[in-house]
Amino acid sequence: MAGIKEACGVFGIYDLDGGNVVPSIYYGLTSLQHRGQESCGLAVSRTDGERGNVQFHKDLGLVSEVLREDTIRNMEGDLGIGHVRYSTTGASVAENAQPLVLSYIKGTLALAHNGNLINTP
């Protein structure tokens, strides 16, 4: 075997009591780091807050490099997702880091996936 080969890692969590899930996402992604070492990110929101208010951070690098304490210190949410990437297609560039965060007419959507989107621009 020529090196680590996995296929991304996706982590999601919701705290029913309204607690901050950012630390849990950080530790979850650290536990999944073996599944992807190219990039990582997280997105969080408050279910009792303003609709469409999603905080996120993503970039190239390992969890410990991208989600540094000074970066995520002010992030808070009771609902969140995280992603570590191992690319099978697509360049290893910051634009391909996840979660994908999209604004649309009803608010903001954060999405993380493991797979390839074909027939797309």
Question: How should each PLM-predicted stretch be described?
Answer:
Residues 1-121:
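N-terminal glutamine amidotransferase
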